[in-house]
């Protein structure tokens, strides 16, 4: 399978993926991000959201979409800071992991969805607001290329069926990368291909009519 598909399964598989099996951010979790340090980060974000709302002319129905919201730590901090933009607006937490969604806060204009595609946006009538994410793009699945004999080739992952390999999976080198990569292929070097991050940015931008 492509390396990107393997990373996707390791992180987000609904049965055995990292997040579905208890992996999380926080002081008692596996890693720490700014929202878990304390409420100050959320207060700063709330002020920035108000600045964006003001710049748009204080529209009613201002919508804040937080992708990869986890258990809602940032949402809690932002809401506690009482930003003016949310007095008549809404804050939508987008989180693909059902285990994390169950721990999110509710009420006070907060709602939750599993994906950006689940937002009720009609074609030609996008949201007015902000789509944001904290440390998401560097946590999306990515492809991997390796330079072999002057050519970038795709790194694949397969099941290790022979008894001499102690790991259940192993990497193999596949076909030449397509489209070609504009980086000199120094023998043995590797580079990530983050096409998923680009797709996410395009999808996020498509949600907004202004913001």
Which ranges hold each PLM region?
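Class I S-adenosyl-L-methionine
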Residues: 5, 123-211
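Rossmann-like AdoMet
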Residues: 1-67, 71-122, 127
């Amino acid at each position: 399978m492509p390396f990107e598909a393997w990373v996707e399964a390791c992180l987000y598989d609904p049965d055995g993926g990292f997040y579905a099996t208890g992996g999380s951010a926080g002081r008692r979790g596996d890693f720490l991000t700014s929202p878990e340090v304390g409420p100050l980060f959320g207060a700063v974000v709330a002020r920035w959201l108000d600045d964006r709302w003001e710049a748009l002319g204080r529209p009613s129905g201002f919508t804040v979409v937080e992708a990869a919201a986890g258990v809602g730590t940032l949402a809690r901090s932002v809401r506690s800071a009482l930003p003016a933009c949310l007095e008549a607006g809404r804050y939508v937490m987008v989180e693909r992991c059902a285990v994390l969604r169950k721990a999110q806060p509710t009420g006070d204009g907060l709602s939750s969805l599993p994906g950006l595609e689940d937002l009720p946006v009609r074609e030609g009538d996008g949201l007015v607001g902000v789509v944001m994410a904290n440390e998401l793009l560097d946590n999306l699945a990515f492809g991997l290329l390796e330079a072999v004999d002057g050519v970038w080739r795709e790194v694949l992952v397969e099941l290790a069926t022979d008894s001499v390999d102690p790991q259940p999976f192993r990497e193999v080198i596949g076909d030449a990368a397509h489209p070609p990569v504009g980086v000199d292929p120094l023998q043995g070097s590797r580079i990530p291909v983050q096409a998923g991050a680009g797709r996410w940015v395009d999808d996020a931008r498509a949600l907004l009519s202004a913001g």
